[in-house]
């Protein structure tokens, strides 16, 4: 594109690279500007936001945040830069909304990396943030901006493993659906709790405990095994590369287990695709009167964010930029996100 606009000028490509990798322009403000257009073109009253982490292949040791994570681009562990994305999972299209680099702990805490941070232009203050925490922070900008209609937030098991990370989503007035490990525990019915009687010696107890003889919590896998066949229904959950993917699903209200204690009442949704048979379980804070058909339909709305990343790599050259610094990652990512939205909107015409 540069050669087409500027001709075979010796400095044209280099100038373009410097503008993208080192230019002092506001990438965050530019990323947020199309959100109103996203809502106008693709928005829904009960929109779904998705959060996901991925890594891009990156060689060398000098690039900011480079490590050997599980790099999805090559399907193995390789030098790469990890990031967290937020997307809009509309039924008409799924554009990117936000993406931020995730710094490994050693890049933040190890003094040996201080000079690398300085050379890479990493902005202070620098703190260690897990991918779920970083994703939730970027997610909060969407409802606060007030330009996108959204009701749901979908996340993978990395998000659902720690329920305390889900609470801020509920505080934003959003309903979450996050996959959870199979060993996640809960109660079919809320167990009775009481403050133990004081025996007259030692410190007097003040905190309630689950009373003796109350039902013990069960893993979500064990709970799902007890569901009768009539509780399962079939849903079309997403579009695959070879056609629609259909899965059987069932939903049940359970009492979540929080640090050993009975927590809030939530939906437990079990999904079983017909082709693979791989079982997935997710936790939802949706109201108790939410129709099962809605839960089944939305259970497949997490994957579009993964499609965004694949589209970026295969169609837009995401990951081919040679920049090493902080801006050299943020700026190209911003342009890829804008280009991806134009690609999604163009497919509607």
Where are these regions (language model features)?
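Basic, amphipathic alpha-helical segments enriched in Lys/Arg and hydrophobic/aromatic residues
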Residues: 311, 316-349
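Short amphipathic alpha-helical "interface-anchor" segments enriched in bulky aromatics
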Residues: 55, 159, 208-213, 290-323
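Active-site-proximal structural scaffolding
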Residues: 9, 79, 159-162, 169, ...
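An anionic, glycine-rich sequence signature occurring as long contiguous blocks
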Residues: 92-120, 124, 128, 181, ...
């Amino acid at each position: 594109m540069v050669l087409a606009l500027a001709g075979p000028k010796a400095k044209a490509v280099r100038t373009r690279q410097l503008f993208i990798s080192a230019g002092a322009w506001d990438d965050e403000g530019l990323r947020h500007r199309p959100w109103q257009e996203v809502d106008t073109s693709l928005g829904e009253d009960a929109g779904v936001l998705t959060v996901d982490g991925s890594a891009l292949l990156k060689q060398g040791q000098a690039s900011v945040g480079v490590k050997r994570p599980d790099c999805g681009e090559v399907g193995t562990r390789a030098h790469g830069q990890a990031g967290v994305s937020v997307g809009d999972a509309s039924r008409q299209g799924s554009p990117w909304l936000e993406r931020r680099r995730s710094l490994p702990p050693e890049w933040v805490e190890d003094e040996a990396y201080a000079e690398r941070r300085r050379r890479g232009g990493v902005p202070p203050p620098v703190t260690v943030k897990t991918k779920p925490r970083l994703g939730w922070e970027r997610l909060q900008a969407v409802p606060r901006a007030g330009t996108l209609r959204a009701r749901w937030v979908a996340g993978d098991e990395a998000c659902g493993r720690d329920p305390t990370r889900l609470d801020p989503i509920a505080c934003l007035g959003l309903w979450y659906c996050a996959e959870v490990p199979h060993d996640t525990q809960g109660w079919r019915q809320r167990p009775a709790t009481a403050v133990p009687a004081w025996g007259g010696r030692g410190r007097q107890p003040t905190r309630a405990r689950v009373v003796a003889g109350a039902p013990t919590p069960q893993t979500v896998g064990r709970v799902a095994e007890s569901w009768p066949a009539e509780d399962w229904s079939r849903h079309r959950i997403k579009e695959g590369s070879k056609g629609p993917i259909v899965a059987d699903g069932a939903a049940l209200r359970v009492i979540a287990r929080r640090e050993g204690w009975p927590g809030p009442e939530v939906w437990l949704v079990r999904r079983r695709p017909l082709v693979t048979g791989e079982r997935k379980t997710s936790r939802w804070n949706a109201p108790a009167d939410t129709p099962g058909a809605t839960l089944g339909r939305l259970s497949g709305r997490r994957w579009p964010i993964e499609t965004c990343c694949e589209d970026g790599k295969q169609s837009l050259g995401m990951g081919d930029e040679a920049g090493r610094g902080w801006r050299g990652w943020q700026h190209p990512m911003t342009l890829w996100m804008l280009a991806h939205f134009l690609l999604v909107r163009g497919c509607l015409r």
